[in-house]
Amino acid sequence: MIPRHVAIVMDGNGRWANRRGLPRVAGHRAGAKVVRRIVEYAAEKPLEVLTLFAFSIENRARPQSEVNFLMSLFLDSLKKNTEELHKNNVQLRVIGDHREFDKKMLAQIQTSQDLTKHNTGLKLIIALNYSGRWDILQAVQRMAEKIKNQELTSELMSAELFQNYLCLSDLPEPDLLIRTSGEQRLSNFMLWQFAYTEIYFTPALWPDFNEETFDQALAFYRTRQRRFGLTPEQVEK
C-alpha cells in the first residue's frame, strides 16, 4: 500500500548546523541538497503528490538575515533545478501567500510552473510562505466575496464546497505526513487537509533525512488501518 499523497515538514536544519558548530545557513544549504535527492527518489515511486513545507508565514519572524538567505536559496534552487524537474516529468506548484515575494521570485515561480505544468509524473508542491490558518482564511474570504457579489448563497455552503476554495483542492488530501527532527506538532501546516492523515515522526534532522528514512515512513504507513471514522470491522468488509 503506497500513499497517493505524502507531505513532509522539513525541520531541523538549524539544529543540524548548531551541533556541528556551523552557522544556521549551512544547515539550510545542506537541507536544500536533501530536497533534491528526496524529490528524485519520490519521483521513482508510484506516488502522485509530494508536498514539502519549505517556509511558513510564521518563519518571517526569524532574523531578517536568515529570512533573506532563505528567500535567496529558494530562488536559486528554482533556477537550478527546474530543468531537471522537467526532464524527470515532475510537475511543480508553489502554494502560499505570495504577496511578500519580490518580482524576481514571482517571475521565477511562474517560469518554473509554466515549464512543468503539462508534466504527468510526480506533482511536487512547495509550500512557501504558507500556513494552514492562512489557507482557511483565504478560502473564507473568497467565498465571502462570492456571496457579496451574489454568485453564491450561504444556504449552499458546505464542507465539500468550502474545500474547493483551499489550496490543492484538485488533489487528494495527504495520506501520510512525515515530520523530521523529533518534534511532534503540525506547525500550522495544512490544518484542514490533515483531518485523517497518518502521521510519522522521525528523530532524523532534515539534512540527515535520506531514502532509508523515507522508506521507513512508507513502511509505517503500510501498517496503518485507515478507518475514516468507521469501525475496524466495517473497514475489513
UniProtKB/Swiss-Prot annotation:
Its EC number is 2.5.1.31. The keyword Acetylation does not apply. One of its GO terms (biological process) is regulation of cell shape. Gene3D superfamilies: Decaprenyl diphosphate synthase-like. Substrate binds at residues 12-16, 24, 28, 56-58, 62, 179, 185-187. It is an enzyme of class 2 (transferase). It comes from the Bacteria. It catalyses: 8 isopentenyl diphosphate + (2E,6E)-farnesyl diphosphate = di-trans,octa-cis-undecaprenyl diphosphate + 8 diphosphate. Its cofactor is Mg(2+). One of its GO terms (cellular component) is cytosol. GO terms for molecular function: ditrans,polycis-undecaprenyl-diphosphate synthase [(2E,6E)-farnesyl-diphosphate specific] activity; magnesium ion binding. Keywords: Cell shape, Cell wall biogenesis/degradation, Magnesium, Metal-binding, Peptidoglycan synthesis, Transferase. Pfam families: Prenyltransf. Mg(2+) binds at D11, E198. Binds 2 magnesium ions per subunit. The keyword Plastid does not apply. The active site is at D11, N59. Catalyzes the sequential condensation of isopentenyl diphosphate (IPP) with (2E,6E)-farnesyl diphosphate (E,E-FPP) to yield (2Z,6Z,10Z,14Z,18Z,22Z,26Z,30Z,34E,38E)-undecaprenyl diphosphate (di-trans,octa-cis-UPP). UPP is the precursor of glycosyl carrier lipid in the biosynthesis of bacterial cell wall polysaccharide components such as peptidoglycan and lipopolysaccharide. Homodimer. Belongs to the UPP synthase family. This is Ditrans,polycis-undecaprenyl-diphosphate synthase ((2E,6E)-farnesyl-diphosphate specific).
